Amino acid sequence: MHSQLRERIRLMRARLDNARPVIEIPAEFQLFVTPAPVCDRLVTLAEISNRDHILEPSAGTGAILRAIRDTAPGAMCDAVEINSGLVRYLRENFNGVRVQCGDFMEWQPVQYYSRVIMNPPF
């Protein structure tokens, strides 16, 4: 058993050694990344389809956007993110998603959305 655990730890360390941070986030932004299984569940519960136009009002690192893209690659997505560094990351990594930089509470959408998906418990 110990050898299996050691091997798992070694593999995790190897993955982390090759990983690079997306961006350094100052504490005042309060970034809460939703785990991938939770994102998948959110998308399933929201019954996302390729016909939907979806808003993600606090996109962060794009965890929910990734789950949407995996489930319904034809869905149109708009995202709002207050951190300009994360906005750059989202624009570079989520082609086709319209990413707005700003505070969602002050943002004025110009259209209606068929679905809004955000970090729980919101």
Task: Mark where each language-model region is.
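Class I S-adenosyl-L-methionine-dependent methyltransferase catalytic core
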Residues: 1-122
